[in-house]
């Protein structure tokens, strides 16, 4: 019986998920870095509460690119856009584009937001903390 070498899954066959860590402890549970070949999970996360936290971070980027309008529902187009962007990032920086995406999410995630509180018809804006799952979105 011959031993088969198990090849790790690389995104688009080029970029590895190994060695990438989330430095922000608040986002660590919500940024999924599960290895995958293509960012397409066929919507398996839709049937449970908070299951979108288990979706790969690259697929979440692709899903957010499909906003209502001209790009609505065109996932193949969004995947190709992300693939081309990752190739450009890889050529210009020489680093793993997945790691750059994770750092960008960490740096761009807001920590505070404001909410409206009304007392007797007067509206006050009050600072509140942002949930980690919303910070990733």
Which residues fall in each region the model found?
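Strongly charged
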Residues: 1-79, 83-137
């Amino acid at each position: 019986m011959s031993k088969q070498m198990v090849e790790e899954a690389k995104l688009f066959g080029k970029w590895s998920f190994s060695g990438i860590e989330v430095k922000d402890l608040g986002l660590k549970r919500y940024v999924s870095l599960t290895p995958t070949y293509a960012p397409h999970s066929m919507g398996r996360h839709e049937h449970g509460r908070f299951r979108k936290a288990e979706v790969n971070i690259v697929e979440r980027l692709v899903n957010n690119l499909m906003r209502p309008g001209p790009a609505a529902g065109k996932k193949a187009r969004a995947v190709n856009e992300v693939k081309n962007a990752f190739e450009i990032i890889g050529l210009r920086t020489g680093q793993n584009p997945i790691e750059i995406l994770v750092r960008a999410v960490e740096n761009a995630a807001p920590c505070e937001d404001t909410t409206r509180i009304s007392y007797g018809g007067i509206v006050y804006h009050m600072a509140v903390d942002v949930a980690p799952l919303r910070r990733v979105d």
